[in-house]
Swiss-Prot record:
Keyword DNA-binding: no
Subcellular location: Cytoplasm
EC number: 6.1.1.14
Organism classification: Bacteria, Bacillati, Bacillota, Bacilli, Lactobacillales
Name this protein carries in UniProt: Glycine--tRNA ligase alpha subunit
An example Gene Ontology molecular-function term: transferase activity
NCBIfam families membership: glyQ, PRK09348.1
Pfam families recorded: tRNA-synt_2e (PF02091)
Enzyme class: ligase
One biological process term in Gene Ontology: glycyl-tRNA aminoacylation
The organism of origin for this protein: Latilactobacillus sakei subsp. sakei (strain 23K)
Amino acid sequence: MVKKLNVQEMILTLQRFWSEKGCMLMQSYDTEKGAGTMSPYTFLRAIGPEPWNTAYVEPSRRPADGRYGENPNRLFQHHQFQVIMKPAPLNIQEFYLDSLRALGIDPLEHDIRFVEDNWENPSMGCAGVGWEVWLDGMEVTQFTYFQQVGGLQCDPVTSEITYGVERLASYIQDVDNVFDLEWGNGVLYGDIFKEPEYEHSKYAFEDSNQEMLLKFFDEYETEAKRLIDLGLVHPAYDYVLKCSHTFNLLDAHGAVSVTERAGYLSRIRRMAHSIAQAFVAEREKRGFPLLKHAQEAKTEVVDHD
């Protein structure tokens, strides 16, 4: 029987597990985004030759998915537990199954299926091969090998594991309504997030200032391009994230037509591609320092042996 960990305990267990596998524990990135993949800890670090292993929780905002806090499973904001390992370990799938064991879920006693589901995020120029992971009939994780990020080929290949925090917690706690989850210390998910869910949904669908958001998108785009020209990759990327979230708000409100939608996504994709190119060029100029660090660490291990 699965021990009913609260959300806090579940996250701590995953952090401890992946830390022991060599992942740095990062903190959530402080700009709105639609998925953990869009954090610079994934988007930027998945490209170029440098190794990168990290794990972090990322609140992910998807305005169109808001349901005023009335739907038991669909949310304006949900949480992802993101694991990035580059280069992808040969036994990454076994690592994942071991992480379920750490949560008290024995793969031999449950129906765990890897269902092919190749992934792409066209607006960010990202694509990969992967699987949805189903646990006793419920999708709880997305497992992806990145092939392309920011329009650049990934070499070496990066592996991404994205746990749906609310979904996995719902399974572990055996609840049908996400707002009934225990977050920690007896406090329910709904006590924390139900009111924000209602307010953000009302804003996205009814009360957002579309004229202002359209203006903001143009200004964010202009600033991102200016910063790219100045070689300020990280501030520029922040503005691309702002463009993406602003577009999502406009899209949720039905403020852009089908034709306009394609145009906005293309504008975001071009900026993301320019930033990816600039980031790799800057890292190369610095001699890819994390690659050197990994080689030195490997040499120290060999010398010690």
